[in-house]
């Protein structure tokens, strides 16, 4: 993740307006923290209550008001492996809707760069990862 953020942030103005969609999730919070550590001060994050990314009108209004220059899209409709397997159509539909809204408004508003991170499931809540080993080099 650090290599990705090092590459992405080397070209950004420290005062640029940066929107991190999904800033409270696993990946989005890591991006937010990394940007803060690198001295970025104009970060925008909205909770689901503040901005429903499934609502295209609300997303357009947000982009109209905030005018972000850069967007990290780490937001997703999530629910765990079991819910993902039971409600597959709901998950793909809602996630495509979020992506369409954020990517579409980024394009319409002339966002300089957008980084889209997509995954159906990152980590289950209660699973042991003891079988994984750390890289040796």
Regions found by a protein language model. Name each.
Residues 2-13:
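A short, basic/flexible loop-to-alpha-helix module at the beginning of a structural domain
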Residues 81, 117-129:
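Conserved catalytic-site region of short-chain dehydrogenase/reductase
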Residues 42-61:
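Adenosine-cofactor binding site in Rossmann-like domains, unifying the SAM/SAH pocket
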Residues 57-96:
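NAD(P)H-binding glycine-rich loop region in Rossmannoid oxidoreductase-like domains
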Residues 17-34:
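N-terminal Rossmann NAD(P)H-binding glycine-rich loop of SDR-like oxidoreductase domains
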Residues 21, 71-75, 114-119:
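SDR active-site strand-loop-helix element
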